[in-house]
């Protein structure tokens, strides 16, 4: 990654933060848990199609998102996803070897010292609740021993970009300046908790961080 591209991504992060503050009553907590330099993996619950922008604006460092290949290939948005360094992932059923290619891309990003962001649920929540994390985190961490920073996002369920009240993006926007809360938690390493327990532990941490955001919004 060239120095100018890094500068562009840092500038975009600041612009996105301002836009998120305009669109939402946006609060961010625990930014200091992300390392100031070096690689890290951020995991968060997946509520809406705005999640990536909210997380990107709330993070103190640019994030490289792992996202579905069909969305990445959107004719009007592909240039943007490439600019911010998004990492596409395709179904093994449609493209044998796709998972390995994505793991290679994630590993390359981490070894460049980037922060990679994944949504372990693998899809938008259909009901506002956090669903079981899918496999994949272990494969990433088996290749690269980086700190994992859990994050919990609250307030976007109910937006037109979520599945609340019907399919996401198939409804008219009905909320403006809604309260949105993002909480980052202390980082952990794969060595602390191994195997399936790692996923369960991270899921529990993300649930707790989302609950903190829900409580904050309820008391505003």
Which role does the model predict for each range below?
Residues 129-196:
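A cross-family acyltransferase "interaction/gating" segment
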């Amino acid at each position: 990654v060239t120095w100018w591209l890094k500068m562009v991504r840092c500038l975009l992060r600041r612009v996105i933060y301002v836009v998120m503050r305009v669109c939402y009553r946006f609060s961010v907590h625990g930014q200091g848990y992300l390392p100031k330099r070096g690689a890290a993996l951020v995991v968060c619950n997946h509520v809406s199609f705005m999640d990536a922008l909210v997380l990107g604006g709330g993070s103190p460092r640019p994030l490289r998102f792992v996202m579905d290949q069909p969305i990445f290939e959107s004719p009007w948005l592909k240039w943007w996803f490439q600019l911010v360094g998004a990492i596409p992932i395709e179904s093994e059923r449609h493209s044998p070897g796709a998972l390995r290619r994505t793991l290679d891309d994630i590993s390359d990003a981490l070894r460049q010292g980037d922060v990679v962001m994944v949504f372990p649920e693998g899809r938008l929540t259909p009901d506002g609740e956090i669903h079981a994390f899918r496999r994949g985190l272990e494969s990433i961490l088996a290749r690269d021993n980086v700190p994992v920073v859990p994050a919990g996002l609250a307030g976007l369920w109910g937006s037109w970009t979520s599945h609340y009240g019907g399919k996401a993006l198939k409804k008219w926007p009905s909320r403006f300046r809604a309260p949105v809360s993002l909480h980052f938690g202390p980082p952990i390493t794969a060595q602390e908790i191994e195997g399936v327990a790692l996923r369960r532990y991270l899921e529990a941490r993300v649930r707790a961080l989302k609950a903190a955001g829900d409580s904050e919004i309820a008391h505003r």
